[in-house]
Amino acid sequence: GETTSWSDPIVTDLRDLSKVRFDPQNEYFQGILNLTETALRHAEGEFIVGYTDLHPGVDCAAALRGSTNLCMDFYDDPEGIPPLLDAAVRDFEWIFNRFHELLKEHGQPSVSWMHVPSFETMHIPSADFSSLISSDLFNEYCLPIHLRETALATHNVYHVDGPDVARHLDSILEMNSVNPIQLVHGEDYGNRSRQGRNLRRHRQDAGTSVIVDLHKDDLAEFMKVMDPRGLFLWIATESEEEEHEIIRSLEQWARSSSS
């Protein structure tokens, strides 16, 4: 798709990671920095600029190795995976701080694509690749990396990309460094599904704040089964009139729930 990123794997042998190194002068990193700086120069007093989407850890490792190859590595060479994961998170602190400092120099909050700003530091951890592995493998290989990356930010909103990632939620929520979670439905997991509503309700009952990407046609049914406390809804609309109508519905929902 046009709104995602693609990569060509470069690691053909887990025992040779010589190609895995970060060059701050590479054209892609410099290009993103230049775009960010240009936006910041035009943003003063007008709008907020976020830093680019960052994917350290297992998703970076999957890009370097290839998802299929990495899946097979868990069977064929599990001892070779930790060095690759370490290489995939090694430079994250420097990169994260570089963007954070750039935003602060221009008086901007710390914010990225999720539009959740922080006056301190904000990060969106994720592990989309974890949809392909078991919870045991997630706990062994992914959690330690998550703990390293989330320790850098004051606020961490975990991006749960679909039901196959959501099966790791209990482990994700054990991390004290993760604040709310953002639940995304898959193509076969729509907001209309009972499974999706039950999952959100289960997380809310556990006291976890939840960001929900919700279709406007699902709002009425959603409000019947959910408590509004701790929710942040993303709802796309077609017009300003529709937006006001949705706001009125949400206000009524909040009043009825608090009474």
Regions found by a protein language model. Give the residues of each.
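Active-site loop segments of alpha/beta catalytic cores
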Residues: 1-3, 22-259
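A contiguous, low-structure linker/loop signature
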Residues: 1-16
